[in-house]
Amino acid sequence: MSSLSIKDVVARYDGKVNSTAQTQGSDTTPTVIQTQQASPHSDLERIVRHHLAHPWRKPCPSHTQQAFEQLQTRYRNDPLPLILDSYCGTGMSTAVLAAQHPEALVVGIDQSASRLAKHQVLGHQNYFLLQAEAESFWRCLVEAEIPLAAHWILYPNPWPKASQLRRRVHGHGAFPLLAKLGGQLEMRSNWQVYAAEFAQAAELIGLPGTLDTFTPDPPQTLFERKYHERGQTLWRFQGTFSR
């Protein structure tokens, strides 16, 4: 199959969004965030600073190590600029990124085999998907000194209860690893509080950036398409690490 344009990739990607979030964990992602938390968590700075002082050291799962070795082999054979699509779900965003960046190698990672199995291959040869735990995969990249040109984190599981802060990407012990990967980083969410927390946490680890609303053109994920069609406000954090 020949490579498709970005417009064609988006138009032809008609996979279904199931009830399971495309990202961390197994909670469902409702159409509108249901939460009692109306502002950034008061414990966020303390937690991020704790993680900076006490590096995350969870052993890497074997399937994630094997997935990383696949990437490492391909990267060593053809060291193109590397773009990582963490929590890629069905991989629509990975395919769109590959179409947008033909000069790069785009890798989508997700911990769910069932979500990855729903991927629709659309012809581009500069991307592939791996089943891996994102946080451990980040550490593998850091330890192997493989830098990122760009990193995308699109609509991560919001974990909307205030008590679930440590389950959010920016509350996780692995969050400071992002600073060591370098490159441009973009995170998108349909929850303003989550996006504001992410921006605050990113600055604490050395990534000042911008937070704004935007209109997706084209939508990068199935969830983004759904949220946009239903008129939800979408939030975007963008920043660049100096490595």
Q: Where are the predicted features?
A:
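S-adenosyl-L-methionine
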Residues: 2-82, 92-100, 120-145
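Conserved beta-strand/loop positions that form the S-adenosyl-L-methionine
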Residues: 86, 109
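Class I SAM-dependent methyltransferase "Motif I" SAM/SAH-binding loop
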Residues: 87-91
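Conserved SAM/SAH-binding beta-strand->alpha-helix loop
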Residues: 112
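Charged helix-capping and loop-helix junction motifs
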Residues: 166-174
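Conserved beta-strand signature within the Rossmann-like core of class I S-adenosyl-L-methionine
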Residues: 182-189
